[in-house]
């Protein structure tokens, strides 16, 4: 039987929620991943060092006994952010600030309205070596939802990189050929996280044969040509600039199967197996370890995990749903098969 042993991976983009939801989902990530970069878009958002440290304590309390999993904490960038906050964050071990353009995604109401007014804050991030994590979509209602990432590149990303050229930027959950091209052409201070859904699915999987709410995420799934461009990027000559970030974003089944369903796919349960499928299909299984376990750690300036995990070429059936507080949660590929299984 084919096996693949790799350095334990890290999830560089994860939503863990809070309260009972946190307790339900944290163990799935802790089983596979050594660390995860925790998104700060709670209600209310994680905007201060005190908020982040309190949230980290709640995450640690939700982990299974004996777990070595480490949450890497971030702050939610707001219009009120200051260079002093950046210095405080650095001193407290916060790894990054996250940009949510106001209204772009789940719990982004407190997001930034004009990033260019925060240039002194970004300059302090560059000085302190704190990363800038970007949800790269414009929110202009005149821009089609399928074009919002591409529009962001010209309107925001390129001008910011020109003004703060040494800022370390992660273009999060990229979905387009344009975003991949930007990262490939930019300096070594720019990298990207890529989700399993944007490597495996296209917008037909969302809309053909009926609306499939469990495939609805933001940024929304794109054309097949964009999916192919992402696979080419994560397996190509400059693959070191791309890394694993699931954007696993749990919402109760009732909130997804809804007249106004929530955006987000829950992939944490079988994340590394889904990525293994991507790399296997691309004939690049030998590049999975770098993508999952090395590139993100190197970009964040942290050592790789010291232990390993082993994947077995053995099919598994993903549960139709799992418990989630008082409700249930539908995982990515619910009821379907994945050709790989982690040996626990």
Swiss-Prot record:
CDD domains: DHOase. One of its GO terms (molecular function) is dihydroorotase activity. Keywords: Hydrolase, Metal-binding, Pyrimidine biosynthesis, Zinc. Zn(2+) 1 binds at residues 13, 15, 98, 247. Zn(2+) 2 binds at residues 98, 135, 173. The modification N6-carboxylysine is found at residue 98. Its EC number is 3.5.2.3. Pfam families: Amidohydro_1. One of its GO terms (biological process) is 'de novo' pyrimidine nucleobase biosynthetic process. Substrate binds at residues 15-17, 41, 135, 218, 251, 263. Pathway: Pyrimidine metabolism; UMP biosynthesis via de novo pathway; (S)-dihydroorotate from bicarbonate: step 3/3. GO terms for cellular component: cytoplasm. Its cofactor is Zn(2+). It is an enzyme of class 3 (hydrolase). Belongs to the metallo-dependent hydrolases superfamily. DHOase family. Class II DHOase subfamily. Homodimer. This is Dihydroorotase. It comes from Neisseria gonorrhoeae (strain NCCP11945). The lineage of its organism: Bacteria, Pseudomonadati, Pseudomonadota, Betaproteobacteria, Neisseriales. The gene is pyrC.
């Amino acid at each position: 039987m084919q096996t693949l042993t790799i350095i334990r991976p890290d999830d560089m983009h994860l939503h863990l929620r809070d309260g009972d939801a946190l307790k339900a989902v944290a163990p799935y990530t802790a089983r596979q991943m050594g660390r995860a970069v925790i998104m700060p878009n709670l209600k209310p958002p994680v905007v201060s060092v005190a908020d982040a440290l309190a949230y980290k304590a709640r995450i640690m309390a939700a982990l299974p006994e004996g777990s070595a999993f480490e949450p890497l904490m971030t702050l939610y960038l707001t219009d009120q952010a200051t260079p002093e906050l950046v210095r405080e964050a650095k001193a407290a071990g916060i790894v990054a600030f996250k940009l949510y353009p106001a209204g772009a995604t789940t719990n982004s109401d407190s997001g930034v309205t004009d990033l260019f007014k925060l240039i002194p804050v970004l300059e302090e991030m560059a000085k302190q070596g704190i990363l800038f994590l970007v949800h790269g979509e414009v929110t202009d209602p005149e821009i089609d939802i399928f074009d919002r990432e591409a529009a962001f590149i010209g309107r925001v990303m390129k001008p910011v990189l020109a003004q703060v050229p040494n800022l370390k930027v992660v273009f999060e959950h990229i979905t387009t050929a344009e975003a991949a091209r930007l990262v490939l052409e930019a300096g070594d201070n720019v990298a990207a996280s890529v989700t399993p859904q944007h490597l495996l699915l296209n917008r037909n999987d969302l809309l053909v044969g009926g609306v499939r709410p469990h495939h609805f995420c933001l940024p929304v799934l794109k054309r097949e040509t964009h999916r192919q461009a992402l696979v080419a990027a994560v397996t190509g000559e400059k693959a070191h600039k791309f890394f694993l970030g699931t954007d696993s974003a749990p919402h109760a089944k009732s909130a997804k199967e809804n007249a106004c369903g929530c955006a987000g796919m829950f992939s944490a349960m079988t994340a590394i197996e889904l990525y293994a499928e991507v790399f296997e299909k691309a004939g690049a299984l030998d590049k999975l370890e770098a993508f999952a376990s090395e590139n993100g750690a190197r970009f964040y300036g942290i050592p790789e995990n010291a232990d390993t995990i082993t994947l077995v070429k053995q099919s598994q059936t993903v549960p139709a749903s799992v418990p989630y507080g008082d409700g249930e949660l539908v995982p990515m590929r619910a009821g379907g098969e994945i050709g790989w299984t982690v040996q626990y």
